[in-house]
């Protein structure tokens, strides 16, 4: 049983209501510059610099000597990219030992890239300093063995610019950018937003209308596809949209695990950005590398359906805990799947074969009291 540490950041057990529990701290707001506008910045006593830059002439903070600099083609060729889970200690901080083990498992299982701090990795529950630290840690420890793609997208163009600058500065190979969510913008606004971040480095655009509330129209993607740093699109709309793009030579990764086999082999997708590969990286590699395999796809569909029975990453967090590879700690607002679903997962593992899953421990059904839910961290 995982017990919460009696500190200022207490873990909260499932079923126990904390009176007046506080929400997670807000994400650190990032801006292009904390200083006054550059146009009014004085250099020397009483003199304006001849090289003063106005806000209309903003220069991206980039370097040709960035660690692990990779080509856009080096990103376009990736077939299996795992949207990796972020594990936690009982007080809600990152469990880096468990995280390192997860990344090593992905490398050994044949994944070619990882998304750090994406939806699956709960980047939306991180402060920006946590987010960039985890990207940097992944690059420093594993960047020579796997492509590190940092989720530095935001619904604020300002934050997306600053986070991408920092992500590339610490060595990430590419950025993942979602379209601005909640405060949705126009078609012209979408192009303007991506126009600001594409100069930073290789970029994958992520279209997931079920989460953002806005579908990125094909006209926008087609316009952006001419940009040198545009690597491709993680597309969640479906096969018809995938084929629309691949017919035009645009690189596409399926964002839907249950569609990725057909997207890859029937509709021209390059590969998948996967949640399921956190659990069975070797089988997902086979699905993406070894040609059409309807039998394997059919075998994995019950697992994929189970994983998304509640919004991602609830299922994945529950599964990895029951496999014994991460602590059963959830940052709120996430909570584990029901006991019925936890029991069903054990049956799915037995049907596919425990040897195909990550970790070495026997899969087991965790009790409600085994889980720790964190509100303050």
Swiss-Prot record:
It holds the Pfam family DHDPS. It comes from Triticum aestivum. Gene3D superfamilies: Aldolase class I (3.20.20.70). This is 4-hydroxy-tetrahydrodipicolinate synthase 2, chloroplastic. Residues 1-51 form a transit peptide. Its EC number is 4.3.3.7. Catalyzes the condensation of (S)-aspartate-beta-semialdehyde [(S)-ASA] and pyruvate to 4-hydroxy-tetrahydrodipicolinate (HTPA). Keywords: Allosteric enzyme, Amino-acid biosynthesis, Chloroplast, Diaminopimelate biosynthesis, Lyase, Lysine biosynthesis, Plastid, Schiff base, Transit peptide. The active site is at 206 (proton donor/acceptor), 234 (schiff-base intermediate with substrate). GO terms for cellular component: chloroplast. Tetramer of modified subunits derived from two genes in different combinations. The record marks 119, 182 as: Part of a proton relay during catalysis.
